[in-house]
Amino acid sequence: MNLKTKFFLKVISVIAPIVIIPTILANCAHINSNELDNAKTNLKGSVEVVNINPYKTKQMLASNINKEQINSYFIFIFNLIKTNQKIEEKILDKNDYEILNWAANDNDGTLGINIYIKTTKQSYLINTKPVFLTDKQNNYLQELKYKTPAVYSIDEILKFSNNPYNLIHNNPYYREQLLRAKIYFNQNEANVDDSKLYMNKIGYSEFGSDVQKRLENAFKIRYDEQNIYQINSPQILAKETKTLTSYIDKKTNNNYSINIELIKKLIQINPFGKLPKNFAQLINLIKKEEYPKFLTITKNESVDNIVVKDIYYRIIDRYAKLEFILEIYNKKTKQTVYLSANFNQKNSGLLKNEDYFQYIFDRTISLDLLTTKDGKNVELNSGTGWIVDRIIDDSLPKNKIKLLIATNNHVMGWSNLAISKDNRMKSRWFNKQEYINYLENNAGFISSNIYEDKDRYQYLLWGTAPLKSPVSNKYNSLSGISFSNLAKVYNITNQNFINRAWYIPQLSANGIKINENLRTWYQINQEDIKSIKNGTLDFVLVPMVFDIEDIKEKLPNYYKVLNTKDEANWYIGLGNSKKYLPQLQLFSGGYPGDVNPNSSAIVSWRGSKSYGSLIQAFDREIKNESILDYYGPKQINNIDGYQKVGEGYLNKLFNVGTRVITSDEIGDLGSGSSGSMIIDSNFNLVGIHFASLNSRAYGAPNDSMIGNLFVAQSQDLSGDIDVRAAVIKKLKAENIYTYKLNPKVSS
């Protein structure tokens, strides 16, 4: 396709996840650089300090900082009061000022800094916000310094085979952290700064003996990347350090090497997953006195001379490479040796990042809708969906199949077809003549198959990338979808799209904070506790009919299992009805908008992998911005819950589903990736992606993904708290049979 083809769409409106971008400097205008230099000494002005690396400062006491760190972690802004009383700002260069002295207040985590501005010849005393550890927080961390989660024997670890819940919740260290958090949040001194310490240890955020307490505590936690559960990073041995595959103790003639079979067994049963980092995560839970069991000795003799001091790694998840290294010390010879063994996909059960991304890629599609505002130009509304199951429908022609597709409510909501503050901006379907005119006017830019397909405008469209990028967290020209590659969803058209969704979760939420202008939406009980009934997840299930030839072309790995004994197992379904654990890594992938101006693609495949998460019971603050507008049949009976528009209703729903906030170790998902599935490192489906958090904007090392979990983790939610169970119940009630969730049982 000609590169110009990408732009014949005129307007590409990509359905985007909510992108939350916290800013460090708001309305910070720069004055001319020579204005401050030419200032008089009696010039009026003030100085403020801004922390640009809170990730670092929140790991230290203010009393431990030095001048170099102050210059590295903070910037200073001079507020110049001009003759017309307007204030202009300049970020000071390091040669504009001199730090005279500073004073720490470890009680509240602040730092007072006295700086001298050279051009004004004045000194200014300024105080930071509480961006450092307080004494109280530091004492808490010091208490934990001598506690360890490494409490298991190897035999105990083997008994927890592929059972992460028992592995984590039977650990006395984790149980103690949970107890500490419960005590802390039941006191009245909980605050957002101290709460971070507890979130980093447990990854779960709902505490309180009653609903009122849980509501209050919900606002004492920041739901961001810095509050996730922190997985301990493996100790990496420097590349230049020499390792040996075997070591002979010349005193005893014993030959020592790594116990290869034990390592392979632990890889195979690892409850955390099959990545090299997952293996290191598991070993972190093993008692140090068990380390000698990782050795193989040629002679069955005492190993009193040899001490296993520590475990190190060289790890690359991208390639499934693991070098397991024991630091051993010979007490007789005073010799230290690093004994190692290498593991990969060929000699063990290890997996690489792309194995997870490939699994997602094979089941994921781009969903695209052509709309227009003026009947002349095209908007392409794009989101991501994935195959849940196949519906058994004998009424279909042999060349068609019906699939249950999952995506976000806001992807399939299509409220832009029903409402707009300005009717001139309201989107709509093309009519036949408008689309024919559009094709004629753009004939020089579009492919022949698009030009000849005169009824394409009537259908929801779908597509996949011809090839998955070898590295899914990077954009690749091979992983794009062009406009001409889109196929039709045959049962969703401009005539029947109002009835597109088969399942929208229904939730009630108790213990909420809500704007008073939404008073007709909520109920109040005798204890003055507010609740709402029109809650949901940002999730819908839509039956879609596909042509098998399109499946063959666009989903070849799926086509291979169609109508075989392996088909039912291929479908991901809706998880396993178990609660997600924040200690498990997450993977997601979808089709955000293509950012390469030299590409003909409209969207491209991209993946994201997280390392540690935070579970938010649900968003208890209900605002106008929280509303999910869904245009379709009436979903709720609340007086303000719907509005008749044309043939359908504009339903107003709130996303009160349990959320997961991640720390994206690699990759990030932008506009168009809304609706991407989220799986854990054991290939279990746990939820759906709907928003992004630009955490790097405030100094965090990684951005975040926000998703809804399919199993609720709050006692204040009711209704479809287990999406899988709710869907199976609905399938059975409506006598709908599928390959995975509700198969026909032969009598």
Curated annotation (Swiss-Prot):
Subcellular location: Membrane
Transmembrane segments: 7-27
Family annotation (NCBIfam families): MAG2960_Ser_prot
Membrane topology, from the record: Single-pass membrane protein
Protein name as annotated: Uncharacterized protein UU030
Keywords for this protein: Membrane, Transmembrane, Transmembrane helix
Gene Ontology cellular-component annotations: membrane
A Pfam family recorded for this sequence: Mycop_pep_DUF31
Source organism, top-level taxon: Bacteria
Cystine residue pairs: none
Chief localization: membrane
